[in-house]
Amino acid sequence: MQLSNEDYYNFFIRCCTNMIDRYDFRFFKFDGISAQASAIGPDEGTRGEENAEAIISIERAVRQKRPDIFLNTTVGTWASPFWFHFTDAVWRQEGDYGEAGDQGTDRERWITYRDRLVYQNFIQRSPVCPINTLMTHGFILSRWGAVSKNMDYDGIVREMRCAFACGSGMVELYNDYKLMDEIKDNQGNAGALWKDLAECIKWQQEQADVLPDAHWVGGNPWDGKKANVYGWAAWNGKKSVLTLRNPSASAQ
């Protein structure tokens, strides 16, 4: 079904408002408003334009019903600051999971893949689009599916910290509880990842006054030949935070 279909559009709005009224919904993820894995605009033709306009109209209606709703609009959005008149987060583009470069473990290459897309689609192509508004699939720890199978403790902690330090207001945790319980830290303590996760959450909450102004620093995580140091910086006149990542397997 397409949101450009009037009957489906009206049904969709009724479902959203009903979930707010009956179940106190405070978050909606709207996915698949386009067939494009990496979008720079709506799908071609009138239908594509109507689908994009329809999701904007739906979000206006939902926001009017509940002003504090968090709206995450994913596949079908593109790197434009104008989306944030209506939604709270947009998709970084391309696949849910992938790997980029030839450096480090599959987990390190996954982080590089994710952040390379942010650099390509937002930093280079749309530099005025804020990067604290992105859905990136922040932290993934699972034994299932096409995801990183490296379970090195230090690598997992690095991925976790990057997910929070990038400043995104949309932090996702795809973490397997059993793995969180089982994986041991460098002292042999199982379950330490829960403490690490709590520390990341606490750190982000303590930086809530500065992270909304997060900016990219450094280079391209993977430029096709070389893995380059990069990171995120934020400041507000009273304090600042700086996070750097070296995606290379050697010191830089």
At which residue positions do the language-model features occur?
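Alpha-helical scaffolding segments of alpha/beta enzyme cores, especially the outer helices
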Residues: R14, N18, E50-A61
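The substrate-binding groove and active-site-proximal loops of carbohydrate-active enzymes
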Residues: M1-I13, S34, S38-A52, G145-N150
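Active-site-adjacent "subsite" loops/lids of carbohydrate-active enzymes
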Residues: M1-Y23, Q93-G95, A100, T105-R109, ...
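Short acidic catalytic loops
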Residues: F12-D43, L71
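Active-site-proximal substrate-binding groove within the catalytic cores of carbohydrate-active enzymes
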Residues: I56-Q252
